[in-house]
Design a protein with these regions (language model features):
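Non-catalytic cell-wall polysaccharide-engagement segments
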Residues: 1-21, 25-35, 39-43, 48-50, ...
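Short glycine- and hydrophobic/aromatic-rich loop-to-beta-strand nucleating segment
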Residues: 57-58
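A short, amphipathic beta-strand motif
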Residues: 199-209
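Short, ordered, surface-exposed loop/turn motifs in non-cytosolic proteins
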Residues: 208-226
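Short, acidic Ser/Thr/Gly-rich low-complexity loop/linker segments typical of extracellular
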Residues: 226-245
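Short Pro-Gly-centered beta-turn/loop motif in secreted/extracellular proteins
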Residues: 240-258
Length: 259
């Protein structure tokens, strides 16, 4: 099975859990291919950085508000957006405090799964999936890369980078450490997130006499007409060692917008 790009000298399979491991590796230097009881992972789950982001995946208050774990600032004693965590938690999934969150790496993994699904649906509802397959500044836009980028700077920053009308130039494309979203999109591309809808299908590549064609480089061209994006996309790709060629669907079947 193919792996993603190296992150702190480690790479992970291009699966949903591989994506979770890779994001955690980048955010907190953990290694979730090891037991959660490993000191490396225990320490990573308790991290709170200088900007107030917490845990294995460096969540901020806004993300945990979106997921229903931390009370919204409007209904909380914590009225700031500074990731100071001085307010009240909702109690969802047994997490009633910052301490509860930091001491439970297994629940943090559950939460990142919920976050992936949340962002997948949000990006679809905002038609950002129309940009999947497009090349921007030399980087192909994929679902996993886009979700990682939204985790870094929010969907506003992602929309700005993609050039979505109403977003372009109105949101920051870099985080508080000056990491640009393009780095995350490139680093976390091509993972199969296995959720939201079946984004990826596989085509078995055969030659004219029926032989399976393995590790064959080729170029795919497609046309798409959506709310924001009407264009032809060209992507260079390669069949794997079984002759399978991954094809990413830009939108869910029930939206009737196919690759």
């Amino acid at each position: 099975m193919r792996s993603g790009k190296l992150i702190n000298r480690k790479s992970y399979p291009l699966t949903r859990y591989g994506f979770i491991c890779a994001v955690s590796r980048k955010e907190s230097s953990s290694d979730l291919s090891l037991s959660l009881n490993e000191p490396l992972n225990i320490n990573a789950s308790k991290i709170k950085n200088s900007l107030g982001y917490i845990g294995l995946f460096q969540f901020g208050e806004a993300a945990l508000i979106d997921l229903g774990y931390y009370k919204h600032w409007n209904a909380n004693s914590d009225k700031t957006k500074a990731n100071d965590w001085t307010g009240n938690w909702v109690g969802k999934n047994g997490i009633n405090s910052l301490s509860d969150f930091l001491k439970s790496p297994s629940k943090q993994i559950q939460i990142i799964g919920q976050w992936i699904d949340f962002l997948c649906e949000r990006l679809r509802n905002r038609n950002f999936n129309e940009y999947y397959g497009k090349i921007i500044n030399g980087i192909e836009i994929t679902e996993s890369g886009a979700i990682a980028g939204a985790h870094l700077v929010g969907d506003g920053g992602l929309g700005s980078f993609l050039g979505v009308p109403g977003f372009k130039g109105n949101y920051k494309e870099s985080d508080g450490n000056n990491v640009h979203i393009s780095k995350y999109i490139d680093l976390f591309n091509y993972y199969d997130l296995e959720s939201c809808c079946d984004r990826k299908i596989y085509i078995l590549l055969r030659n004219q006499i029926g032989q399976i064609v393995k590790n064959k480089k080729l170029t795919i061209q497609s046309e798409y007409n959506g709310k924001f994006e009407q264009s032809k996309f060209t992507v260079d790709t390669e069949s794997d060692d079984q002759g399978l060629l991954p094809v990413i669907i830009r939108a869910c079947p029930h939206l009737k917008n196919w690759f």
